[in-house]
Curated annotation (Swiss-Prot):
Family: Belongs to the UPF0337 (CsbD) family.
Protein's name in the database: UPF0337 protein asr4653
Source superkingdom: Bacteria
InterPro entries: CsbD (IPR008462), YjbJ_sf (IPR036629)
Amino acid sequence: MSTEKRIEATAKNIEGKLQEVIGEVTGNPSDKAEGKAKQAESQVIHTTENIKDELKKAID
């Protein structure tokens, strides 16, 4: 498990949520979309790390 990657992904998720809310409040669809994209990227990173963890368990 790469703790550093998970921390980065969590930070990106928080950043994305904030950006999405700012886009919603200001009526800026670009910010809202970018925020959602960052959240999706965060999920991909977390899923990748989960798969790596499971593969390591299976090999050991």
